[in-house]
Amino acid sequence: MITIKKGLDLPINGKPEQVIRDGNAVTEVALLGEEYVGMRPSMKIHEGDTVKKGQILFEDKKNPGVVFTAPVSGTVTAINRGAKRVLQSVVIRVEGNDQETFAKYSPAELVSLSSEQVRQNLQTSGLWTALRTRPLSKIPAVDAVPSSIFVNAMDTNPLCADPAVIINEYQADFTNGLTVLTRLHNKVNLCKAAGSNIASVDNVDSHEFAGVHPAGLVGTHIHFIDPVGINKSVWHINYQDVIAIGKLFTTGELFTDRVVALAGPQVKNPRLVRTNIGANLSQLTANELADGNNRVISGSVLYGAKAEGAHDYLGRYALQVSVIAEDTEKEFFGWISPQANKYSITRTVLGHFGRKLFNFTTAENGGHRAMVPIGSYERVMPLDILPTLLLRDLEVGDTDSAQALGALELDEEDLALCTFVCPGKADYGSFLRQALDKIEKEG
C-alpha cells in the first residue's frame, strides 16, 4: 500500500449521500469537442440528421480510425463552433431507442479474445476514446502500444462518489471489462482505495493507495508504479468506462449511462444520480439548486469546466457535477477581518481552526500577482518533483526546464491543488497545457 501524506482534502460543504438514484430526465445530450486534446474533427453528420446510438458523429483527422459515436439516438440539433471554427459541441435531441450493434461474446469467451478483436470492437463502437495517454492526455493512436494500462477505481476529489458503491452495482460488468483489458495488453494495473472490497481478476495487478487528495488521481498512481517520459507512455481509464467495456463485449450494445455525484454547497439534496454521458446539466440540475446565482461545474470544483452555453453538458470523463455560488460582491476591508467563515491553508484566518466545512464560492479572495514561494506548493505536492521550480518554468514558458523537472508526467488535474493554494492566483493547469502542446510540437 502507498500512503500519500502531502496534499489536501478540501473541507467543502455539500458532500453527497452515497446512494444511487435516478436523476432528472434530460432531452438533450452532447459531445464536447474541446475535451479531446489535439483532436481535429472530420464531421460525418450535419444539423438535422437523425442518428442512432453508437453511430459515428465525427472522426479525428489527426488520428485516423479514432471515431466518436452518438451516446443516444435522436436528431442533431446543433453543431457549435468557437473561434477558428474549433468544435465546441454536437448536440442531440433524445428521440427513440435505435442503436447500432457491435460484436458480442459470452463471458467465457472473453479470456480467449485477441488484441486485434478487442481493438476492433473498441474502435468501431467509439469506446476507444475512453482511453487516454500519459504523457499528453490524448486518445491513443489505433496501433499504439503502451507500457501498461491503469484502471482508476478510486477517487479523492472533493464531493466525489465512492467508486465501490457504483462498481458493486455493476460487479459482473466491471469484471468482464477488466478481462477485456487484459486481452488488450498484458500489463494492467488496478488502483483502488486501501481496504476496498473491489475485486480484481487474473492477470491484473492490484495496488492500494491511502491518504489525502491527490491519492486518488491517476497521475499519482502512474508516478509511483510506472512513471512515464518522453519515450515511454501508459494508458489510463476510469472505472465506469471499464463497466461500459464489459457491457459492450457481452451485449454488443453501447452503454452510456453515467453515475455522477451531484453535490456542493448549493445543492439541496447532494447524492449520486444516474444520467447519461453528455447530459444537459441545466436539465439535470433543474429544481435541485439553492436560490441565487450558481456556478454549475462539470467535474471537480478544483479543475472542472464551467457548464454554460455550448458547454452546458456533462463531460465525457466527468464523474461529478459540482455546484458553488457565484461570488461577485467585494468585501469591505476583507483582508483585515478575522474571517471565521473562510478557509486558508496558510492558517492566516480564524476559519482554519476547528474541523468545520465551508461554503466555498467562486471568489478568488485576491487579485493576480507575482508568484510567491512560501512553501504552499510543497505542502500539497506528493510527487517526487520540485513544484516551485516547475511552476515557475511553466509560468514563464521554459519548456526545456519544465520537461526536465517532470512536466510530462502531469495533467491539469495534478496541478489543481497548486492553483488552489497559490497566493498569486495563477492557473497552473493552463500553463501546463500550453507547455505540453509546445513540447509535442517542438520537442
From Swiss-Prot:
Signal peptide: none annotated. InterPro entries: NqrA (IPR008703), NQRA_2nd (IPR056148), NqrA_C_domain (IPR022615), NQRA_N (IPR056147). Keywords: Ion transport, NAD, Sodium, Sodium transport, Translocase, Transport, Ubiquinone. It is an enzyme of class 7 (translocase). It comes from the Bacteria. It catalyses: a ubiquinone + n Na(+)(in) + NADH + H(+) = a ubiquinol + n Na(+)(out) + NAD(+). NCBIfam families: nqrA, PRK05352.1-2. Composed of six subunits; NqrA, NqrB, NqrC, NqrD, NqrE and NqrF. GO terms for molecular function: oxidoreductase activity, acting on NAD(P)H, quinone or similar compound as acceptor. GO terms for biological process: sodium ion transport. HAMAP family: NqrA. PANTHER family: NA(+)-TRANSLOCATING NADH-QUINONE REDUCTASE SUBUNIT A. It comes from Mannheimia succiniciproducens (strain KCTC 0769BP / MBEL55E). Belongs to the NqrA family. NQR complex catalyzes the reduction of ubiquinone-1 to ubiquinol by two successive reactions, coupled with the transport of Na(+) ions from the cytoplasm to the periplasm. NqrA to NqrE are probably involved in the second step, the conversion of ubisemiquinone to ubiquinol. This is Na(+)-translocating NADH-quinone reductase subunit A. Its EC number is 7.2.1.1. It holds the Pfam family NQRA_2nd.
